[in-house]
Amino acid sequence: MTSTIYIHQPEKAVSFTRLPNFLFEAPTFSPLSNEAKVLYAFILRRTELSRKNGWADEYGRIFLYYPICEVVALLHCGRQKAVNTLREQQYAGLVEIQKQGCGKPNRIYPKSYEAVPNTDFKKSRSGTPED
């Protein structure tokens, strides 16, 4: 059986998403599911696009849209799992989700992680992020 040895080939560049170490190293985030950690990495990537495109609210806070159907496709999961994964992030203090109503997708505001309280956010039941 032969294997291919890969060498740097610029014409076949691969895209990467950064996964922050603090999600695995900080005790506060140890209860967070791996799906929530991966989704947060993709949210951070979209945050950079939102910043470049000038997507900020009236207070200057960067926001993004991540419809539930896109979370389902990204994580290869069902709708309820996608909603619960966003809810986990909200309870962990990683994002703020603002409902817009009238069939519009929710705004997601990524938050700073330095001052997140230590809480068991998987058991919390308040709020429901939906698209």
Question: Where are the model-predicted features located?
Answer:
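Active-site-proximal helix/loop capping residues that flank conserved catalytic or ligand/cofactor
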Residues: 37-41, 69, 106, 123, ...
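Generic structural motif
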Residues: 22, 100, 113-115
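Charged low-complexity intrinsically disordered patches
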Residues: 2-3, 112-131
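Short recognition helix of helix-turn-helix/winged-helix DNA-binding domains
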Residues: 1-69
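Winged helix-turn-helix DNA-binding recognition segment
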Residues: 34, 46-110
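A periodicity- and composition-biased signal for non-globular, repetitive helical segments
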Residues: 24, 43, 85-87, 128-129
